[in-house]
């Protein structure tokens, strides 16, 4: 499959992936039901800006929640954050069933690549695959998030090279399992043409500003097409 064909396929999937859930979200009371979205991951979805400051209401789960409600005003929707700062996907996988799937989510997002550089590609893939398969087995839709950028971009060092490769790993997993992809890494790339541009989107060594969180929320929200 060519790159163009992949992009077309991804675009079509973005339109249809959540169809059954979006149809339910369009229903009015008393025919509607509660829809649960779980955001699982590390410090970024947890809302950390300049550590130890946590800016919950400027982080992408809350921004996403507002975007969803603007598009689906009749839906009762919970966006539940199960993210913990400092975690890798190994940590997140160990508590995935207990902390994330216990909410019986209709949709779960997974965001760990920034920290997964500490564990390497093989262990990261095993942990991500385990979480994906557990979610899909229970009928939960999955949207994977590629990493947001960090200050390794300025250095263009091994840390940056690893981040690029982890982003590609997440894309590969989304393609392998035919699930959703929120390409945060690509969204940052579209808005940053020179090093000084990153200051608008980076609040800390490796945490986005609100503007950076908006980019992530928009990537996820592309699956929530208003009816």
Task: List each language-model region with its residue ranges.
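Active-site segments of SGNH/GDSL-like serine hydrolases
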Residues: 111-115, 131-167
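Cell-envelope and extracellular/periplasmic
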Residues: 44, 52, 81-87, 109-117, ...
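Alpha-helix N-cap and loop-to-helix initiation/capping positions
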Residues: 52-59, 122-123, 127, 158-165, ...
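Internal alpha/beta domain cores that form substrate/cofactor-binding pockets in large enzymes
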Residues: 36-38, 69, 74-103, 115-145
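A short acidic, helix-capping loop that chelates divalent metal ions and anchors anionic groups
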Residues: 46-50, 88-90, 116-119, 151-156
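Serine-esterase "nucleophile elbow" of acetyl-processing enzymes
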Residues: 7-82, 95-104
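Alpha-helical structural signal in soluble globular domains
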Residues: 63-71, 99, 130, 134, ...
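Catalytic His-Asp segment of secreted/periplasmic serine-dependent ester chemistry enzymes
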Residues: 12, 22, 148-227
